[in-house]
Amino acid sequence: MPENYTPAAAATGTWTEEEIRHQPRAWIRSLTNIDALRSALNNFLEPLLRKENLRIILTGAGTSAFIGDIIAPWLASHTGKNFSAVPTTDLVTNPMDYLNPAHPLLLISFGRSGNSPESVAAVELANQFVPECYHLPITCNEAGALYQNAINSDNAFALLMPAETHDRGFAMTSSITTMMASCLAVFAPETINSQTFRDVADRCQAILTTLGDFSEGVFGYAPWKRIVYLGSGGLQGAARESALKVLELTAGKLAAFYDSPTGFRHGPKSLVDDETLVVVFVSSHPYTRQYDLDLLAELRRDNQAMRVIAIAAESSDIVAAGPHIILPPSRHFIDVEQAFCFLMYAQTFALMQSLHMGNTPDTPSASGTVNRVVQGVIIHPWQA
């Protein structure tokens, strides 16, 4: 490497860095567009949401699937509707387990490219299995199959994200968060909309501004060999996505794991050693937060990990007893909003860890065996 090489300098000019940095602007652009589409969206959705026994499945592959993991629990509790998260990779292999012909279905398909074989096949299988099936694809690619098929369908409403969210880098960054914010705004507009979400955008922008040129490293630099992200409820989905970002951008050179704080005790905690970094996403809900802090204190008492870092909206004696990050000041955030803040740190950590290990984050898979749009999938026709 040249003598003046630094990870921060290498990040400059990558698509991945640009796509991380433009997220707050992209969210407001998309939610403003949803404001303009509200009447048309309501015309499509309101008759469906009145149907008894309507199932709403949030689906996608990889990172796109984790959107459902993050937001489905809150959407279900907030709206009282039957939201669930099922990856396309499960719908395609086991449609008989998830698609019930007796219940009307709204399939919300997330996709950056909209061309993943499983995503296209999941739509076809849903139509094949469920007589009363409707579709709301939320995608970043106007030319993708998900979008194009939907605009030519009578049972679908296609929602297109701003063009800049069709990430050119290998890993999904602005695409996941913009699709996530947009789905929340569609189904919970009284809570998530282009005005209220400015608080989230501003807080995340403050995080990115505080991180500067990323030269310091989000969690510092140390010779760790493993990272574990922990989060409760929907934040476990954010932890899962955070772990995947590290695996993708380091091409597996840094092993990454995720769990819930309570689940981590039941075996997975065995992986913690003196080369392990643990990051705890602390819930903003006062009840859930107790469990997060219990595990945080326990991990620090164990003194097995190289470092245990808490990221929280507010400090406490337990949080402050070890390495921690306090989110920039703002109003109280519910966890589904706070997830966006946690992902800013996780995406930036993955980018800088990739560069620190000598990878090229826009194309981290030197072998070419892992692709931006998955390849090698054979879709087998369903035969009842």
Swiss-Prot record:
Signal peptide span: none
Domain SIS: 45-197, 215-364
One CC-aspect GO term: plasma membrane
EC number(s) recorded for this UniProt protein: 3.5.99.-
UniProt enzyme class: hydrolase
Effect of disrupting the coding gene: Deletion mutant does not grow on N-acetyl-D-galactosamine or D-galactosamine.
SUPFAM superfamilies: SIS domain
Gene Ontology BP annotations: carbohydrate derivative metabolic process; phosphoenolpyruvate-dependent sugar phosphotransferase system
Pfam family, one: SIS
InterPro entries per the UniProt record, alphabetical: GatZ_KbaZ_carbometab (IPR050303), GlmS/AgaS_SIS (IPR035466), SIS_AgaS (IPR035464), SIS_dom (IPR001347), SIS_dom_sf (IPR046348), Sugar_isomerase_AgaS (IPR014180)
Reaction catalyzed: D-galactosamine 6-phosphate + H2O = D-tagatopyranose 1-phosphate + NH4(+)
Gene Ontology MF terms in the entry: carbohydrate derivative binding; hydrolase activity; isomerase activity
Top-level taxon in the UniProt lineage: Bacteria
Record's keyword terms, sorted: Carbohydrate metabolism, Hydrolase, Repeat
Induction info: Induced by growth on N-acetyl-D-galactosamine.
Family: Belongs to the SIS family. AgaS subfamily.
Function summary: Catalyzes the isomerization-deamination of galactosamine 6-phosphate to form tagatofuranose 6-phosphate and ammonium ion.
UniProt name for this protein: D-galactosamine-6-phosphate deaminase AgaS
Organism: Escherichia coli
Gene responsible for this protein: agaS
